Amino acid sequence: MEGRSVSLRFLPALTADRRRLYSNRPHGEPVHAGSFIRKRRIVVDRELERQPKELARILVHELFHFAWVRLGNPARHSYESLVRKEWEQRARGELGWSAESRKRALRNRLRSMRGAASPHWREYVCESFCDTAAWIYSGVRRHSEYTLATRHRDRRAEWFRTAFQHGAIPI
């Protein structure tokens, strides 16, 4: 990865609600981490300091939020097309809870791809990208959240190999 530095901060008891991140507050739902793209900052729940594999998986996921915004429209549309094909094939599962939870919510909102331009769809595609990157690059080979079928995993891995074949991943 290459780009300007990204600061990392550990805080206790992270929760999030309506795109806000809290520490030690009774607001929102528990989360592992959050990224602030413009501020170039990642905040991680302090509990992960004692879980190196989970920390690696979560950190890679968060770093790829920075990669997503630098990816450019053609590559983002290409990845979206891959995910759209999975959706049309009714692929079950995902490569992380971030994408899985959004995919489940989308099933209730979208019965066809007419809503594919919605913010919910775009958020799902981004989370899918970040969870897939964490699966590929974190070194965590097995996890209970890796539920996407092998054939779809293989297609995503090939997409990443092709997209980033020329060197460093810009963040």
Residue ranges and their predicted role:
Residues 1-4, 17-32, 76-171:
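Metalloprotease/metallohydrolase-associated module, dominated by Zn2+-dependent proteases
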Residues 6-10:
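Generic structural signal for residues in well-ordered beta-strands
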Residues 11-81:
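Active-site scaffold of zinc-dependent metalloenzymes
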